[in-house]
Amino acid sequence: MTDQEAAERFGARIDRLADRATSDCAAFEPPADPPDRDQALAYLREGAGPAISVYVEARTGGQMVHFPPERYHALEGAMNDWLTLYAACYGVDSQVSYTLREAAELLLDTANIADVAQILTGVPER
């Protein structure tokens, strides 16, 4: 795969993830009786986890795919949106701001997106 093909393939995935994060944020209704663990985990499995995975995949496998700044920020913003929604499912109102690299390193260390979210957001308390 050429660099251009890789950039286009990853770009399309990033665009879909960013659009879904925007939709999830717009549709979010705080749980009436937090925590809503199932919804929190869904935001991780269907959102933050795939966003981090795109970053990891692009940085491994022998090909260092470059993301233009707007795509990188869209992917990082989507991940942070889902981490914010995850915390909100526990009744915690916060705007998180982590780098994809921080999250990717944690994912590689823990192999568990729920652990990554707990470490980054502090939710739920341990």
List the predicted regions and their residue ranges.
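Acidic, polar-rich N-terminal leader regions of halophilic archaeal proteins
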Residues: M1-R126
